[in-house]
């Protein structure tokens, strides 16, 4: 069974630097596991690897979609499995790097057999929402699937629409279908998580990075997206941390200082969610951010596999 390496961690933990070092030490090819890096024209706010970093270690599954397009965990699994197969067939090691834990989980455990999106049914749901309001549709979801209804907020039209769509297509609730597991990953997976052990250090790194983004032209980047006219705040791309807060600022809803504050807080909340996922993860080797021995530890594990 071929080997694959997962390098997971919260935002601003040093994943990219370590991944590039690994590519110099091992026959690895990087696959990005990040629901924001997939989008073109979203470079600064996603801390996308620089041209120099990409020259050292090309990343697959970045810059693959326009921000107007949605992308699901199922889409990611299909794309990642294709890339992993191609890398392994060349005798190299797929190195999957990122912080979108849902993608890692879906890849590792296999996806539930959810039906594909149906544009006609989805349009019908949108029409009902326009006529009755999303709260009425949320009430319907609570009746048919109380578990999903408790988890999905009435103000989350994307997930609410998907839950209703799944039921109308299949006759089964989202909760029923997600309890059915798909096929696992046909690789020997070495799993690593990198993060600072001191939460205050991570918070400081997040604040420094957000300010660096602001100084590096983040406002201009989001303004270009804002001025396109075809993007809305409920799209997954614009809901990305930092982008939503800057969007609100450009829309005149918040002042600049408030935007900065909210962006930093939202990024810290994202990091907290990522750490919560990782603490519940089984069979993971923890690495301390910035520690000099990290590369040697990963290389040693890979050599044993």
From Swiss-Prot:
Cofactor(s) demanded: Mg(2+)
Keyword NADP: no
Protein's name in the database: tRNA dimethylallyltransferase
GO aspect biological process, one term: tRNA modification
Gene: miaA
Site (Interaction with substrate tRNA) residue list: 100, 122
GO molecular function: ATP binding; tRNA dimethylallyltransferase activity
Catalysed reaction, written as an equation: adenosine(37) in tRNA + dimethylallyl diphosphate = N(6)-dimethylallyladenosine(37) in tRNA + diphosphate
């Amino acid at each position: 069974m071929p080997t694959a390496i997962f390098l997971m961690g919260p935002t601003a933990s040093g994943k990219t630097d370590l991944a590039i070092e690994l590519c110099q030490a091992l026959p690895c090819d990087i696959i990005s596991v990040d629901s924001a890096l997939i989008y073109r024209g979203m470079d600064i706010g996603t801390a996308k690897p620089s041209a120099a970093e990409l020259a050292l270690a090309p990343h697959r599954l970045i810059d693959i979609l326009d921000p107007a397009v949605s992308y699901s965990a199922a889409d990611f699994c299909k794309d990642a499995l294709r890339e992993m197969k191609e890398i392994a067939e060349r005798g190299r090691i797929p190195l999957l790097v990122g912080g979108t834990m849902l993608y890692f989980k879906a890849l590792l455990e296999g996806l539930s057999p959810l039906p594909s999106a149906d544009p006609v049914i989805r349009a019908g749901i949108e029409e009902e929402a326009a006529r009755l309001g999303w709260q009425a549709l949320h009430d319907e979801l609570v009746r048919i699937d109380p578990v999903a209804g408790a988890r999905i907020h009435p103000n989350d039209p994307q997930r609410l629409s998907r839950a209703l769509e799944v039921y109308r297509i299949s006759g089964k609730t989202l909760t029923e279908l997600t309890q059915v597991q798909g096929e696992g990953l046909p690789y020997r997976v070495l799993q690593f998580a990198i993060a600072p052990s001191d939460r205050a250090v991570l918070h400081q790194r997040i604040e420094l990075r957000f300010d660096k983004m602001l100084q590096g032209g983040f406002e201009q980047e989001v303004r270009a997206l804002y001025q396109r006219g075809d993007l809305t705040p409920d799209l997954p791309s614009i809901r990305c941390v930092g982008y939503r807060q800057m969007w609100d600022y450009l829309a005149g809803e918040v002042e600049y200082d408030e935007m900065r504050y909210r962006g930093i807080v939202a990024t810290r909340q994202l990091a907290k969610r990522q750490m919560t996922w990782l603490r519940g993860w089984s069979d993971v080797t923890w690495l301390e951010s910035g520690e000099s021995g990290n590369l040697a530890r990963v290389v040693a594990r890979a050599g044993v596999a």
